[in-house]
Curated annotation (Swiss-Prot):
Post-translational changes noted in the entry: Predicted to be exported by the Tat system. The position of the signal peptide cleavage has not been experimentally proven.
Transmembrane region(s): none
Entry-linked InterPro entries: GriE/MELC1_sf, MelC1, TAT_signal
GO MF, one annotated term: copper ion binding
Signal peptide span: 1-36
Purpose of the protein: This protein may function to deliver copper to tyrosinase.
Similarity-based family: Belongs to the melC1 family.
Tagged with keyword Cell division: no
Keyword Transport: no
GO terms for biological process, alphabetical: melanin biosynthetic process
Protein name (database record): Tyrosinase cofactor
Length: 140
């Protein structure tokens, strides 16, 4: 996975925003009544402008802790969870994180130690691993 930086995030956001505007116009022209019946299908791009993505910048994670590269950000779909989640990568390997009902976060490495943010979960995993490599977590 390429290194996630703010520049890449903003570039992707700009491309997504310009593509969402073009796609929404074509979709409305093709089916005028379809927009009124949309119930948030995951195929419909959510952000309509770059300004809509600015609140997500603090959620982007790209840092080095104790020599380990940590990247992460909001992620749609994948795994057995529904809706929008958060993906965290430790040295390019996905660290499975999950949000609890109370808003705290856990990871597959520090499952019994909930923390307030995905960033804190990644940092706790780095501490727990003590330099060991993260083994990919199987999907099934």
């Amino acid at each position: 996975m390429p290194r996630l930086t703010r520049r890449r995030a903003l570039t992707a956001a700009a491309a997504l925003a310009s593509g969402a505007g073009a796609g929404a116009g074509a979709q409305a022209a093709a089916a005028p009544g379809a927009a009124a019946h949309d119930h948030g299908s995951p195929d419909v791009p959510l952000p309509c402008s770059l300004l809509d993505l600015l609140p997500l910048l603090p959620l982007l994670l790209d840092e080095v802790i104790k020599g380990r590269g940590i990247q992460g950000g909001p992620h749609r779909g994948g795994g057995h969870h529904h809706g929008t989640g958060y993906a965290v990568f430790l040295d390019g390997v996905e660290l499975h994180v999950m949000r609890n009902a109370d808003g705290s976060w856990i990871s597959v490495v520090s499952h019994y130690d909930p923390v307030p943010t995905p960033r804190a979960a990644a940092r706790a995993a780095v501490d727990e691993l003590q330099g060991a490599k993260l083994v990919p977590f199987p999907a099934n």
